[in-house]
Curated annotation (Swiss-Prot):
The active site is at H65, D118, S211. Gene3D superfamilies: Trypsin-like serine proteases. The gene is Klk1b22. This is Kallikrein 1-related peptidase b22. Residues 25-256 form the Peptidase S1 domain. Glycans are attached at N102. It comes from Mus musculus. Its EC number is 3.4.21.35. Glandular kallikreins cleave Met-Lys and Arg-Ser bonds in kininogen to release Lys-bradykinin.
Amino acid sequence: MRFLILFLTLSLGGIDAAPPVQSRILGGFKCEKNSQPWQVAVYYLDEYLCGGVLLDRNWVLTAAHCYEDKYNIWLGKNKLFQDEPSAQHRLVSKSFPHPDFNMSLLQSVPTGADLSNDLMLLRLSKPADITDVVKPIDLPTTEPKLGSTCLASGWGSINQLIYQNPNDLQCVSIKLHPNEVCVKAHILKVTDVMLCAGEMNGGKDTCKGDSGGPLICDGVLQGITSWGSTPCGEPNAPAIYTKLIKFTSWIKDTMAKNP
């Protein structure tokens, strides 16, 4: 099974592909029940893989580095390890990684690698039922403002050093920073199709297990979790999110061409 550890130690020269240990919420809090009805849990077979976002009844958005050959999708979940009557299970009929994402990086990530275009659309095999606990979220129409307070959510590890998924969906509030902050912090390229968000004092972050999940700034979906540093939550090292305003045309075109 292929999965990429995208959260890299700052001094690391490169990293090989490894079993799924994705990005997580660190220093956050239990999300209010059903407060994130667009949140998706993406599984590879029966193993939790990544987060995702419901865009409409037929489409889920996640990170391209979450690519696998089979998926199980859960909608409307609050608890990762418990059955919930309101949750919905779906399969994926086809996946659409962004064509400009460098898929060779699923094997290894050398120093200076460019992880731009880290997004993927998943076409559900059966439309989601829209309910009080399963709702899509709109794509952004304007650029996010620097300094905005953003909310990230996911079931990634709540332990900084040991991979430990929580049962309850976690939320964390973080700030949006100029990309120059992340350029100084990371050994990989930071480009204009990325967002830089986190707490400069450390302690609050996404990390292993949150990849593909939403970043909502001032109430608007602006990003999905992409990559960052290990250990997560270090001072002066915000994480990287795919900047969705740069990709709305591709997302809409892909959805329209694959009804």
